[in-house]
Every structure is written in C-alpha cells, then in structure tokens.
C-alpha cells in the first residue's frame, strides 16, 4: 500500500508539474540553463509552500523541453502509455528517447520512473544515476532514489537522498515528511 502511495505521488508530480508552470510565464529570451539556474535559486530561497510548488512546476516544464519536437512527442506518448499502465510501450518510447538524445535528463528520469513502477529497482537506479549525472539538482530523481533505497531497507542512504532533495527544494513536503520519519526510525535503531 505504501508502495502504491509513493508511486501515486511520483506520478502526480511528474504528470501535473507542467500545470503549475502555467501560473508563471518564463522570462523572454533567456537560455534554458540560465532559466533553470534562476528557477533553482528562487526554489531554494522560497519559504511559501505553494509558491515553491509553482517554481518547481516551472522547473519541470523546463525539464520537459527536449529541444526536439520528435522527442517531445515521444515523451507525450510514453506518459500516456504509463498512465494506461502500458509500461512496456512506455519503455519502448523511452528507450528510443535516451538513444536519440542521451543528454536529455528527463528522458532518463521518466524511464527510471517506469522501471520503478514495474519494480525493476536496479534498472531504475541506473537511470536515476544517469539523470543525476546530467542534472544533479533533479529533485524528482533524488526522491525516486530515496524511495527505492527506503523500499529496499537502506534507510540511512535513503535519508541522505531525501536530504539532498531538500537542499535543492527545501519546501518539498513529501521529502520533509520522509526525512522526519526516517530520522525517527533510525534514531530508534541507534545508528
């Protein structure tokens, strides 16, 4: 049941994040890395949870922009297949995406998410690690990593991954809750 709840949270973040971006238009004529840097700076400083969610949504919207109409279309198809629980179909699209555009972090992250949904944790972790090599601030990948580590009984390392996510996105409620829970559990074990 907890696995299903975590999966629902991850899917909700991934699918609805672009909707938050609609609230706040991006600055005109700024490069994608500059936009992301500015958004991450704002996200780290923001102390209002709802405002932070909007900024995170803008970051997700930037991550979704591959720079290729074909890749963007395949991402949409893979998302639709995932929503319909057609994970093999989603993986087919995502395999093509990471082959055609290996420097696109969100392609790797989405493939990691599908592997997670299929409980292929080793493959998911490999894709998460690739995502984080390309975008070390990817709070979605960090929380995905933490969820897998927690699920597989590696609570200390999971706590570290959640703390890394909070260093990027301090107002992320899910990560705050998990840090509190894991810290309490580990304190009870006498780490």
Regions inferred by a protein language model and the residue ranges of each:
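N-terminal leader/linker segments that initiate helical-solenoid repeat arrays
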Residues: 2, 19-72
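Alpha-helical adaptor scaffolds
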Residues: 68-140
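Residue-level signature for tetratricopeptide repeat
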Residues: 42-45, 80, 114, 148, ...
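Residue-level signature of tetratricopeptide-repeat
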Residues: 111-112, 145, 179
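Register position in tetratricopeptide repeats
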Residues: 83, 117, 151-152, 184-188
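Alpha-helical linker/edge segments of TPR/alpha-solenoid repeat scaffolds
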Residues: 48, 64-71, 155-160, 182-191
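TPR/TPR-like (Sel1-like) alpha-helical repeat modules
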Residues: 43-45, 153-174, 180-184
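Conserved structural position within tetratricopeptide repeats
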Residues: 61-64, 98-99, 130-133, 166-167, ...
């Amino acid at each position: 049941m907890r696995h299903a709840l975590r999966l629902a949270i991850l899917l909700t973040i991934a699918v609805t994040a672009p909707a938050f971006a609609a609230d706040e238009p991006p600055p005109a004529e700024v490069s994608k890395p500059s936009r992301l840097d500015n958004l991450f700076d704002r996200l780290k400083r923001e102390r209002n949870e709802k405002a932070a969610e909007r900024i995170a949504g803008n970051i997700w919207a930037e991550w979704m922009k591959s720079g290729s109409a074909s890749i963007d279309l395949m991402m949409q198809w893979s998302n639709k297949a995932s929503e319909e629980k057609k994970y093999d179909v989603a993986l087919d699209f995502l395999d093509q995406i990471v082959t055609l555009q290996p420097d696109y972090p969100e392609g790797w992250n989405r493939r990691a998410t599908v592997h997670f949904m299929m409980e292929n944790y080793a493959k998911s972790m490999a894709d998460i690690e690739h995502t984080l090599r390309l975008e070390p601030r990817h709070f979605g990948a960090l929380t995905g990593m933490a969820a897998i580590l927690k699920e597989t009984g590696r609570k200390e390392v999971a706590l570290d991954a959640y703390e890394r996510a909070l260093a990027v996105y301090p107002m992320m409620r899910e990560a705050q809750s998990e840090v509190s829970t894991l810290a309490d559990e580990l304190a009870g074990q006498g780490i």
